[in-house]
UniProtKB/Swiss-Prot annotation:
This is Putative competence-damage inducible protein. CDD domains: cinA (cd00885). It comes from Streptococcus thermophilus (strain CNRZ 1066). Belongs to the CinA family. PANTHER family: NICOTINAMIDE-NUCLEOTIDE AMIDOHYDROLASE PNCC, NMN AMIDOHYDROLASE-LIKE PROTEIN YFAY. InterPro entries: CinA, CinA-like_C, CinA_C, CinA_KH, Competence-induced_CinA, MoaB/Mog-like_dom_sf, MoaB/Mog_dom.
């Protein structure tokens, strides 16, 4: 099914309001497995709207008109649609009663003939009741094309769509199901390159890659009549993706850290810490508490996070974490030594199961001979301490700091998963 959205209102064309309805409707229709092919905006002009309707009727199976259902002279959507279809406007009984009730309880409001328009629908249409306003919507199919009229205000349109329109549309259509895979440790360009054959040959399910700061997302989507059917199809595609190797021989399966739109590396670590009954602390230099703040974002953080340290200067690193100042001066703050000593010191002082440390060069200037984006991340548990070096090049200062925390969370995640495998 090809769908088209028509926003009616001169105020949209002049930029006075933003057409947020288009985004909302497109998302809702996609969830139903209905493909939106066109977004159109037209002013409050009958001739131009008739022209748009003529074009839409020839290229779309579902035409949804938003706006122009109110009581003013320029609210002409229903009148124009009726004229286009060669039908009359009739009164909907329930909408008329709602109009009567509205004015009966507001004696100071003047009821003009224009107000009656809000209770009218196109002859033969099924009314879509307005749960938060007065203007009734409607849905009608003529010569194989389904036309829908909806109010313009989002506060009226959204409830009408969710509670009136969607049930009317879902009777005969499959639903779009999606699964979101989240990757860390592979860039979008490489990921797209190594699964190019899957993307090029996709029909159903489909693959859509998205890049976020420091990570990549793949949305797998399929049309199905049930969740079970969708899962079977998506499982096959996911396994094909997981079995693919990166350019340096890593398995993509090892780079998938989780699922879902709102998931994050921070949450995965928080979840695993709670699952295994472990605690964590952190000592942060260049990230200045970002790692700890991310952990504390989740309700119940006190179960896994006792407290931590922000040690920006060399002197504070020495004083707060019991690291000999002479050793810090010898190795420099941007080093494996400092990252490991910070992680160990924080872990011991808080008696936590894991200590994480971040030290490096946020930029834009170099430090101790290290270019901007050079970061050392230390991790200590009750048995050992180690560190990694990453170079986050070509990024802003804020991006370097944020991506550094992602590397730190991934390091903890891997350690927790290894502990799980050893149980």
């Amino acid at each position: 099914m090809k769908a088209e959205l028509i926003a009616v209102g001169t105020e949209i064309l002049t930029g006075q309001i933003t057409n947020t309805n288009a985004q909302f409707l497109s998302e809702k229709l996609a969830e139903l497995g209905i493909d939106v092919y066109f977004h159109t905006a037209v002013g409050d002009n009958e001739n131009r709207l008739l022209s748009v309707l003529d074009q839409s009727s020839k290229r779309s199976d579902l035409v949804i008109l938003c706006g122009g259902l109110g009581p003013t002279e320029d609210d002409l959507t229903k009148q124009t649609l009726a004229k286009f279809l060669g039908k009359e406007l009739i009164f909907d009984e329930e909408a008329s009663k709602k109009l009567d009730s509205f004015f009966a309880t507001r004696p100071k409001h003047t009821r003009t003939p224009n107000n009656e328009r809000q209770a009218q629908i196109v002859e033969g249409a099924v009314p879509l009741q307005n749960l938060t306003g007065l203007a009734v919507g409607g849905i009608i199919t003529v010569e194989g094309v389904t036309y829908v009229v909806l109010p313009g205000p989002p506060s009226e349109l959204k409830p009408m769509v969710n509670q009136e329109l969607i049930p009317a549309l879902t009777e005969n259509h499959t639903t779009l199901y999606s699964r979101v895979l989240r990757f860390f440790g592979v860039g979008e360009s490489q990921l797209v390159t190594i699964i190019k054959d899957l993307i090029v040959n996709q029909t159903d399910p489909t693959i859509a890659p998205y890049a976020k700061v420091g990570e990549v997302i793949l949305r797998l989507s399929t049309k199905a009549s049930s969740q079970e059917e969708a899962d079977r199809k998506l499982d096959v595609l996911e396994e094909q993706i997981r079995s693919t190797k990166t350019l340096d021989g890593k398995s993509l399966s090892d780079l998938i850290y989780g699922y879902g739109e709102s998931n994050s590396l921070a949450y995965e670590v928080f979840y695993l810490l709670k699952k295994y009954g472990k605690t964590i602390t952190a000592a942060e230099s260049l990230t200045a508490g970002l790692f700890q703040a991310s952990v504390a974002d989740f309700p119940g953080a006190s179960q896994v996070f006792k407290g931590g340290f922000v040690t920006y200067s060399m002197e504070e690193k020495a004083k707060m974490l019991d690291i000999p100042l002479s050793k810090l001066e010898e190795h420099g703050v941007v080093s494996h030594f400092t990252a490991e000593k910070m992680a160990e010191g924080a872990r011991v002082k808080t008696d936590s199961d894991y200590g994480i440390a971040l030290t490096g060069v946020a930029g834009p200037d170099a430090l101790e001979g290290h270019q901007a984006g050079t970061v050392f991340i230390g991790i200590a548990d009750r048995n050992q301490v180690r560190s990694i070096k990453v170079v986050i090049g070509g990024r802003s200062r804020s991006d370097v700091r944020y991506i550094s925390t992602l590397y730190a969370f991934n390091l903890v995640r891997q350690a927790l998963l290894q502990e799980d495998n050893s149980i």
